[in-house]
């Protein structure tokens, strides 16, 4: 697993240890080829859909019960690490391969899955303008995309269809197609390592909302424009960034978080009063109404600041997704699998959002977390210990076996 993750990390626009792999870039296409080869080497039936999602399937004896699906993404933000997402793909291949290897041995018959098991290399497109995963799960999202953009990007590398609607229709998942979706992932937080716990059993994924706010003033010369005469867009933006923090802390909940991740001012010269300011704001919570209350408060603050500072305001909600709760069957299967392996567990909330958040719209979902060093992620020194990776894959394998409802002698669990 460590070797396979390292090979995958080398398909990057930046040198090791940094990983940059943008969707449908040349290195992403190389990574796709590597993953498909691994699937085939492990006797999985490989297919790709029009959106670019890759599936590897192991058929079961019960075709009517829906597939037990596992997987994650392999794209990587600029200068990221080698475990985010990729663990859930490479680890899933090994988990299913381990179950396949246990089908028979020299002396006994072991595991036979009932529901089919499948792996998914999710086409997330987080770092282009196209929310592919959202479109996959919720085709109405096509109305938010630039005309022709999904088709153009997908067609450039051999995916796509004649129209965006045709592409979305081709990949839409029908109700019942997926019995369960399970995702293995690094925690991207410090709790498991801090508490010395082996496995995180995810009970819910926080609801993300993204806002874009633009303030516009008149600008002017930094020396010639007197302070009483200014309508400084940069200061309006600074006030709003602090207001985000104030409204988030005002909820009194540690589950509410807010980040002003982008703050751009123009013209950006030391001797020029800022004429424009653009803020990208991220607000998350496991409680949807509480999150929405913070969103409303931030937008109200933007209006108050704009009026008081005499700047023009344009704001919009980019996305406002609902939270997702893990299905009880998956939570119990993960906990039982960890217990059978003698591993400690912690029930916890995912404050980062994952492919599972979107899969929750079409299937019961759940997640397995493993510790990562200092909780670091989205940076080159992202790291999980080999033994933690192994624990996560073992728990995933047993969880898939349970959810597939296959035949496996009790003493093998």
Question: What residue ranges belong to the model's regions?
Answer:
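A short beta-alpha structural unit
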Residues: 22-24, 259-268, 280-286, 312-331, ...
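Alpha-helical metal-binding/catalytic segments enriched in His/Glu/Asp
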Residues: 70-73, 79-116, 209-215, 221-247, ...
